Structures are given as C-alpha cells and as structure tokens.
C-alpha cells in the first residue's frame, strides 16, 4: 500500500480534525489543531478546505461571531466515507513503515 504523504496526508488530517467537532469548526481552529502535528500555513490550509468543500467532502455554513461572519466546516457523508478510506490506508501504510523501521511485523488492531 502506498500512502501519498503529501496531499493525502494533509487531507486526512484536516478531515480528522473536522470530524472531531460534530457541529462543525472554523478555519482558524482547524489550522491550530493541524499545527499541533505538522507544519502548515494558513495560505496552504485554506485552499485545502476549499478543495475539500468543492469535492463534497466538507459542508460549510456561516455564523456570526463577535460581530463578524465566521465560516464553519463539517464533514459531509462523502467526507466520512473518504476519511474512513484514509484511515484504512493509513493503518496499512503505518504497518509497512513499522516493519521497515522496527524490523518486525506488527499486528493490525
């Protein structure tokens, strides 16, 4: 199994972060949560959010916050399916990397 550690990894992380908030979450918080595990700039992340929305993996809605409109993102049903695919691929990819780095075969949980 080959897991694209560029675009696919960032997409998987973004979808996972958004999935943690069932009512949705906003761009700045997504950026902060993603930055806990990888370096990413807002100028990189916002186009990813727009692309995931265009691909029907994310839904958006606007809500007023402190006198301004804030755009919220939440997973669509297609987004849940895609996230599940990414998670399955990641498990296989991680097992292969573990075998190489640790020198032993790992059990898939």
Set out the residue ranges of the language-model regions.
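N-terminal helix-turn-helix DNA-binding core of bacterial DNA-binding proteins
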Residues: 2-44
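Short, hydrophobic-biased segments on the C-terminal half of alpha helices
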Residues: 49-51
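Amphipathic alpha-helical dimerization/coiled-coil segments
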Residues: 84-109
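Beta-hairpin "wing" of winged helix-turn-helix
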Residues: 55-69, 74
């Amino acid at each position: 199994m080959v897991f694209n550690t560029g675009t696919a990894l960032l997409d998987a992380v973004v979808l996972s972060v958004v999935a943690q908030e069932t009512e949705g979450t906003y761009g700045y918080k997504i950026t902060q949560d993603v930055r806990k595990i990888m370096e990413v700039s807002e100028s990189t992340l916002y186009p990813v959010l727009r692309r995931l929305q265009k691909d029907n993996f994310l839904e958006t809605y606007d809500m007023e916050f402190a006198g301004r409109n804030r755009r919220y993102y939440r997973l669509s049903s297609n987004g849940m399916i895609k996230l599940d695919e990414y998670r399955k691929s990641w498990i296989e990819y991680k097992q292969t990397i573990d075998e190489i780095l640790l020198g032993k075969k790992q059990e898939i949980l």
